[in-house]
A protein has these predicted regions:
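Short linear motifs at protein or domain termini
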Residues: 1-102, 213-224
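Anionic, Ser/Thr-rich low-complexity intrinsically disordered regions
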Residues: 13, 178, 206-207, 221
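Short capping/connector residues at structural and topological boundaries
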Residues: 34, 168-173
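Short arginine-rich
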Residues: 205-214
Length: 224
């Protein structure tokens, strides 16, 4: 296909990557769907090289699988795999909260300014709240000062993003997130480690169940 002559290959690869990722996130491309490099090149009006770059990047990030004879496939959702990732995430975050409760300088003012606000000041944009939710949980781990723990936690965050973000497509879930984040922060600030950990664990477990429900529903609707 003829590509726009002004576009550099690397920015083209970025555009193809972003578009495919959006297609996967919005269920236009469904888990198990197969396609070839040629299909993508034609649809995106791009040459093979940037398309290949974009596809391999999505494969590295766990969104696609490559089959050398039959092209590419959107990786089927494996809820056992997501379950395992959520379990590891809980372990890391509980350890972080426990450590934060013992620290003199917690440095959580920034998180409080976002989550402990009047109802009228709460945001309701799903994408924005989803990004802020990630920043909240990553922020708790980063606040411990353990860079290796934060790195591992962020890797898991990236792997579960595809299903986790669906939690914020419902207003009731956004409201619950504000309430729960506020309570978790309160408990940490009061250095009540057991309570903070219990609140956090319940918060993540409920979110995990909601996400599974919403994902299965969205897949059923998309498959018609």
């Amino acid at each position: 296909g003829a590509r726009k002559p002004s576009e550099r290959p690397d920015s083209l690869a970025e555009r193809v990557y972003q578009q495919l990722k959006d297609d996967i996130f919005d269920f236009r491309l469904l888990p198990g769907d197969r396609f070839s490099e040629g299909d993508v090149a034609e649809r995106m009006q791009a040459s093979r090289t940037p398309v290949r770059q974009a596809l391999y990047r999505l494969e590295r990030e766990g969104y696609l699988e490559v089959f050398f004879r039959s092209g590419w496939q959107v990786r089927p959702f494996d809820f056992n795999y997501f379950e395992e990732l959520y379990d590891v995430r809980i372990v890391l975050e509980l350890a972080a909260v426990n450590r934060l409760c013992g620290m003199a300088e917690q440095g959580l003012e920034g998180l409080g300014a976002i989550w402990q606000v009047d109802e009228s000041a709460r945001l309701d944009d799903a994408q924005l709240v989803s990004a802020l939710d990630e920043a909240f949980h990553c922020g708790l781990v980063q606040a411990t000062g353990n860079a290796e723990m934060a790195r591992m936690h962020y890797e898991i965050t990236e792997k579960i993003r595809i299903i986790r973000r669906l939690d914020f497509t419902q207003q009731a879930r956004i409201a619950a997130t504000y309430e729960e984040h506020g309570s978790i922060l309160d408990a940490i600030l009061r250095r009540q480690s057991d309570q903070a950990q219990q609140l956090l664990k319940t918060h993540i477990e409920v979110s995990k169940q909601e996400v599974r429900k919403i994902t299965l529903h969205r897949l059923a609707v998309a498959r018609g």
